[in-house]
């Protein structure tokens, strides 16, 4: 807002399970019950009840300091239904962290609930409006960097960062090292660890403890990767995989970046075999 960059509301989150024949989007009652038969489907109605109950009960975990209860155990103790786990909790968590759905039940329940609480996701009727930058993130980057754009070095990969008394030495590839007063490493933790010439034991322990996984990403126009009902289409579209495997998502870039195009441009993670 301070950069006076235009935004628009774009984020919603539907789930599509081709095997179970289920799809829904929680943005409205009409989208939630886009499949009218879900009005009479006991498992779906049970999932909706469990969502409301979870939103009411889960915040109590935040008052239990030091609780390391796994998410799966917390849900089992609360007797939450299978549909709630498979078609709500796991898809939401796997999509947020782009992680293997099978690992979600091992997440610390308190961490999971705190994230949902901090982002206003433990309520149904008063959720915050998630917004996207009009024209993409490049717009605010342009405005943010205007005062110092002439000092930005592009296409200059850094090989090493070395601490010196009273400063830091940065060694770009194929260039002489440059001394700075201070350096911020705005990159992934494993990359930061790889750049440090002399990491401390604490830095090795912390930066080396965060795992990453690769995701296969494809840009395409195959709308079969979106839910069957256009009413359910959204910026993020989660695919339930019957045989497990890494998280499978399709991002609708026309929605996320407000592309004025007759054909939907889609980005799919880890579901390449389904793309025509």
Predicted stretch roles:
Residues 1:
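N-terminal glycine-rich dinucleotide-binding loop that anchors FAD/FMN and/or NAD(P) in oxidoreductases
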Residues 4-114:
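Mobile amphipathic helical/loop "lid" adjacent to a hydrophobic cofactor/ligand pocket
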Residues 8-11, 154, 213:
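Short, basic and Ser/Thr-rich N-terminal targeting/leader segments
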Residues 79-80, 93-101, 145, 149, ...:
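Hydrophobic/aromatic-lined pockets within catalytic cores
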Residues 112-173, 178-181:
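Helical element adjacent to the flavin cofactor pocket in flavoenzyme catalytic cores
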Residues 156-276:
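Mid-domain catalytic core of redox enzymes
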